[in-house]
A protein has these predicted regions:
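Alpha-helical scaffold elements that line and support the substrate/ligand-binding pocket
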Residues: 45-75, 79, 180-188
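Penicillin-binding protein/beta-lactamase superfamily catalytic region
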Residues: 89-192
Length: 192
């Protein structure tokens, strides 16, 4: 029911202190749910899902922590695993910017056979097939015409903005090192 908000939010609204002031909670409270005309009730909530879950988590956690605070206290500190949901100012210099591959590179790379070191999971025809299956549902999505999630967002490079990197979007904006992820995977493998 909330695949997108009908308003763009300020990136700083996702900083821990502002989450605790209920800025995102108030936005969620004020929105009516939207559903596809076909009556289907499921739709992809890539970004809003993390915001909604963070609000629920904060309310059920006995200490009133956000997911970012929980990850820091329960994973980052005990395992010394570099995993952040909301990067602290002191750690911003450690974050590598997200860079989109050019469409031309993706197109030509997709024709390369995987045994020759293709750096994409799918070849051109697999990607085209997936896109063809998505088109009908994209035409019915309720997010059509919705504003961008963030004030000032123009493209994917916006996720490199320090205000975004410091914000908590658990479903789409967690930063980690490979070693940090390996430590968490090792703990999970040992049922820890």
């Amino acid at each position: 029911g909330l695949p997108a908000f009908q308003t763009s939010i300020e990136p700083t609204d996702l900083h821990t202190a502002n989450i605790k002031l209920n800025k995102i909670g108030q936005i969620i409270e004020s929105h009516a749910q939207t559903f596809r005309p076909s009556g289907r009730t499921r739709e992809y909530h890539a970004i809003t899902r993390g915001w909604i879950v963070n609000e629920l988590f904060r309310r059920v956690d006995p200490a009133g922590r956000t997911i970012g605070e929980f990850v820091e206290a329960s994973i980052y500190q005990p395992l010394q695993a570099d995993i952040f949901v909301g990067v602290k100012s002191a750690d911003l210099s450690r974050v590598t910017p997200v860079k989109m591959l050019s469409g031309k590179f993706q197109f030509w790379e997709s024709f390369k056979p995987s045994f020759m070191g293709r750096r994409m999971e799918n070849n051109f025809f697999q990607t085209a097939g997936k896109l063809a299956r998505l088109v009908p549902s994209m035409r019915q999505r309720t997010t059509k015409g919705a504003p961008s999630p963030f004030v000032g967002m123009q493209n994917i490079d916006f996720f490199n903005d320090p205000a975004i990197v410091q914000g908590e979007t658990p479903s789409a904006n967690t930063n980690a090192t490979a070693r940090g992820l390996a430590r968490v995977a090792a703990a999970m493998a040992m049922k820890g």
